[in-house]
Amino acid sequence: MASPTDRPKLRKLDRSVLNRGDEVLVVLRDPFGIAQPAAFPQEATHVLDMLDGQRTTAQVRQSLLLRGAVNLSLEDVQGLVAELSDAGFLDDDRFRSLWDTARREFMNNDVRAPRLAGVLYPEDPTALANTLNRAVPEPHDRRFAGSELIGVLSSYQPFEGRAAALLSATLQELPRPQDIDLIVMLGTDHHPGRLPFAITDKGYGTPLGDLRPEPELVAALERRLPWIRREELRHREAISLEMGAVLLHHIYGAECPPVLPVLCGQAALLTGEDEAMTDAFLATMEHVLEGRRVFWWISAELSHAGPAFGRPPLAADGVRALAERDLACIESLVAGRPEQFVARCMEADEALGKPSGAAALSTMARLLPIGYRTELIDYVTVKAVGPDAGWVGLVGMRFFQPAVIDDDE
C-alpha cells in the first residue's frame, strides 16, 4: 500500500464515463496500451485530479476534506493509489517495468502483431475474409491497368454499416501491384508522442498474412533523421495502420508491394520553430522516394466528438456543427491548400477538438505531388464504437496524378 509520504503522479490517460445501471464509473484507458482499461467509482475522480506528483497521499486527503469534495480516509486514498500503481496508471517504477517488458517484446519481433483481431474485426482468417468480402467485395476486380490513382483516404472503423459502404465506394480502380514499388501508409497516431512521426521496419501482421516492410528504406530515413524511430513503440497500438494493413492484404494478398508505415502525431501540426522536424521529414521523404512508383494509403478520420473521446456531450445541433467543420476542412484538402487545412483544424473548439486525422491529412497534402487531383467520394457521420456516446466524421477520397498539360495546345 502507498505510504503517506509518497507523491504519486497519474500518467496522461484517456478518461470516459460509463453508466452501468444506477452506478456511474470513470474508465481509464492507456493510450500506449501498456496498462489494461480499468473502471473506478466516479468519486475517484476527485483523487485522480490531485495526483500531480507534488502532493503526498496525506496532503491529497487533507485537500479533499478542506474542499468538501469527498470524505475518504487516508487508507482509502492509499488503497486507490496502490490500485492505480498495480494497474500501471502511475508514473512510477511499476509502470516503467511494464513499459520495458512491452518494449522488449515489441522490438524483438520482426512483425508487428495485430492487436485488434477479435476486438474490431474477426481473428479467424476465414471469418475475417468473409467480413471483408461483404464490406469490400471482389477485391481482385478493383485493380485497374493504367490507373492514374496515386492514393486513397480511408477510415479505420469496423468493416460494417456506413463505414464499409464508404470503403467500398472509395477503393475502386486501384493500381495493380506490379505497377507499385512502395505503399506509404500514413496513419493517425492517438498516442501523446513528443515527435511528429514514427516509422518502423517491422512487417505489419494481420490474420490473413503479413505485409512486407522495406528495411533498406527505413535505414536510409534513419541515417538522415536519427530521431525517426525513437518512438517506434507507438506502432504497437496503431489502430489506424492495423486496419489499413488488413484492407491492403484483402485487396492485394500475397502480391502486396512492400509498405512503409508512418504514424503522424499531433506534433506534426506545430508551426514556427517547432516545425523544423516536420520540414526535415518532408524534405527527406521527397529525396528517398524520388523515382519510385509510390501509392499513398492514408488511414485517417475527421472529428471525434463526445464522451467516447473524452470530450463534452454534443449539443442538440452538435452533429450538424461537426459536419460543417469537417466539410470546411475537406474543402481545403480538395483545393490542395495544406496550410489552410491546418489553420482550420487548429481553430479552438472545446466540444469538437481538433479533427482526429489532422496530422496525417496535412502530411499527405504536403507529400503528394504539386497539382494533385482529388475526388471526394462521400462524407458521413457514424456513432462511436463502444458504450459511450460519440460521433465520428468519415470521409472517402481518391487522389490522382496532376493533369498533364499539352504544350502544343
What are these regions (language model features)?
Residues 1-49:
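Acidic, low-complexity/disordered tracts enriched in E/D and polar residues
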Residues 28, 397-400:
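Short beta-strand element of the conserved SAM-dependent methyltransferase core
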Residues 32-122, 126:
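Long, charge-rich, low-complexity alpha-helical segments
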Residues 45-50, 386-387, 405:
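Short, surface-exposed linear segments at secondary-structure transitions and domain or protein termini
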Residues 110-371, 379-382, 402-409:
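Active-site histidine-anchored catalytic micro-motif
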Residues 381-390:
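Short proline/glycine-enriched turn/loop segments at secondary-structure junctions
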Residues 390-396:
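Short hydrophobic/aromatic beta-strand or adjacent loop that forms the aromatic wall/cage
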